[in-house]
């Protein structure tokens, strides 16, 4: 009897152990586990597709989502599967950087900061070219206003004003615009930071900040020069109002219809040809931070954040200067518009009674300014995603990088504001060019010539070159994704026997969401990528959702790539 009781107890313990096996294996994320989400439309099941083997006795149904192969996603993990909408089949994804044993996303964070600084550098470089071009335009206008219409006292008695208005006043060709941008900020070769981190991050980031600060100083200097030119032009505008005060043409003895004067090409400024292209941006090599990744990184990045904040202040100050300059030029345009009204002084055709004198006096085509063609495309934008700092968190690194990102965002906003100010300035200068082109067209000839129609044909400035233009497509749908939950794990499958591709299949619902078909078309020309992910990353947990390129990159870079070799799972 005692033996029977022992046997019963042994059998009971074995049954209990078997019942606990599934839960324990799921908890330990082993090769076998039980289904955790039977009621979900989005389930991922890994097993041998050919044999249809399953774990824990769960019944396979048509709504399960499964992948042939090993336990590459584990049990109960969330997996994001995305189908790229673009026809580009060569989308390259850069995985997270790893920094030794405890690693983390420090590299990705610094890379994002570097990319943002590069974008700001390109924007400011483009702005420098635009302001330089505007400076040349204003300088040309200053020259044309100072000499416009100075030959209005045409023709002595009997000469029928033959050379009247033939002055080429202000026919400056304008500036050629800014040159091409520099080669950008290049930060050395690969850095190695030893066993416990620290190293030259501060030097790299501070070098970038110093370069930006110098660039801001240069643009501020250009703004001061343009402001000075604006003041000079304003003085010229005040002194030009007395031009062409009536012609002293012939006494009536001249033959009718004589040469009449050409009317001049006064004010025919060609304007600036616009700025050159931006620089190549900031290149930061791979960083390795040793065993613990910590060290002096936080302090280094904090110093960089402080430097970038200083740049933000400089750019903000420069924005105010350019805005003030825009107002000054706008006011100058208004004053010039009224001062140029004396250019019709050639209409006093009281001489040469036998001719059709005065019929075309002052017929200048003033104000035909072409205006500026506008700036180029925008920069690549600022995208700051979630930072992960590994097992030990990296101390104050997160706060330091967050401060740096905030400062960079401030710079980006300031540059954006400055862009608007410079755009306003360009419009004002264009208006100024039109206003000043009518002054100096002193075609006071009293002959029958109708020439003089080319006065003031300013070409304006063509604007500077833009950045990479990435913002233009920032909000476009790049991929469609679904979230699934891994439920079952079965025996391994040699994916090399499957032409190197993991075999994937899915429920009808998922296929319809991804491909618009009851069957998943894994062999089409679009890339389908699966990565494990977390449900708390802000993306929907049920149903298909669209993502932009930057969001897709975030999902891929922050996901955990897994296949039987620990690499990315990719179809096609």
From Swiss-Prot:
| Listed Gly residues bias regions | 166-185, 258-282, 359-382, 453-469
Q: Which GO terms describe its biological process?
A: chemotaxis; defense response to Gram-negative bacterium; killing of cells of another organism
Could you name the domain of life of the organism this protein comes from?
A: Eukaryota
**Similarity annotation:** Belongs to the dictyostelium lysozyme family.
Its keywords, alphabetically, are:
Signal
* GO MF terms held by the record: lysozyme activity
Q: Where is the signal peptide?
A: 1-17
What name does the UniProt record give this protein? Putative lysozyme-like protein
Region (Disordered) spans which residues? 145-199, 231-297, 326-388, 433-469
Which intervals carry biased composition (Low complexity)? Answer: 145-165, 231-240, 326-358, 433-452
- Gene that produces this protein: alyL
